[in-house]
Regions:
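Charge-rich, low-complexity N-terminal segments
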Residues: 1-117
Length: 117
């Protein structure tokens, strides 16, 4: 059988989340804290196998839905911003920006391996 590439596109109602963030523009400027409604669309390209399938796409639908659930109703903060320092204690993250400290309950925050959001 000739092998060929094909693309599967996944989009479901559970592939959404609401999350807050702030975009940091410089050492002294940032957006106010605010949130967005995100819809996730996944496109996967792979070789089609002899049975006419690429893979069991149900795994990816489930996994993306689980990731969206983890990000739902959470505040996203970048871990690697050059303008944002953070410390923590047992219950809180303390984010320091432009000489001001913003405390957040740890359960309300997801630290992202990014420089900005």
């Amino acid at each position: 059988m000739n092998r060929y590439l094909s693309t599967i596109e996944l989009e479901k109602e559970n592939m959404t989340f609401n999350a807050g963030h702030t975009t940091i523009f410089s050492a002294t400027e940032r957006e106010p804290l605010h949130g967005h409604y995100y819809q996730v669309f996944t496109s996967i390209t792979a070789w089609v196998s002899d049975n006419g399938m690429k893979f069991d796409y149900r795994y990816y639908k489930k996994r993306v839905g689980e990731l969206c659930a983890q990000l739902n109703q959470i505040f996203l903060m970048p871990m690697y911003s050059p303008y944002l320092q953070f410390s923590q204690d047992a219950d809180y993250y303390y984010f320091k920006f432009n000489q001001k400290t913003m405390p957040f309950l740890k359960e309300d925050v997801k630290l992202m391996p990014l420089t900005n959001i």
